[in-house]
C-alpha cells in the first residue's frame, strides 16, 4: 500500500472513530443515574441528562416508559413512584442510540451536604477502622460530588456509585455513612448517600448567584 492510500485509510478510520465517539457521547444521563444508582422510593422520580440531538428521549424502568423532547441540549423525564427493591435496569434511548443503566436499587436517598463537619471522613473518626472493616453492604450505595467550584451551574459531574465496603467507606463522610448505616438497619431498604460537602463554605456558595444577591446580607 502506497503512502497516499495509507493516508486515505487513516483519514477514513479517524473520521469513522470521530463519528462513532460523537454518536456515543451525544446522549448522556446525569452521573446520578449510572450503574449501581439508588432512586428515592414512594415519590415521583426525575431523571435527566444532556444530548446533542433534538429527537425525543425515552426512559424505561420497572415497566414504565416515559419520554421528553430535549430543550437547549437538556432532557428531563419523570417516573411514577416506585416501591423499594431492585435491582432494575434503566434503558435510555434516542433514535438509534441506546444506553442501559444497570443494578439500580430503589429505597431512601439522602444528600450529605455541608461544611467540614460533613466532610470529615470515616477513616478520621473514632472507631473508623472497625467501621471500615465491617462495612460490606450492597444495600448501601455511595457517590461523591467532586469538590470544585464553578461560576455557573453545571449540568453534570464526574462520579460513580459504589457499594459500601472497605475500599469505599474510608474516604466517605463519617456523619453521612454512620447515618446511612443505622437507617438501613432500621428500614431494611436500600440507602443511597450523595456526598456534596466542602469545609469552610458559606451558604451563598451553595446558591445560584442570582438568588444569593437578593439576600441583603450577602451584598455587604
Listing of model-derived features with the role each one plays in the protein:
Residues 4, 19-22, 58:
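N-terminal non-cleavable signal-anchor helices
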Residues 24-220:
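Cell-envelope and extracellular/periplasmic
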Residues 1-11:
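Bacterial N-terminal signal peptides that target proteins for export
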Residues 10-20:
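Bacterial N-terminal signal peptides
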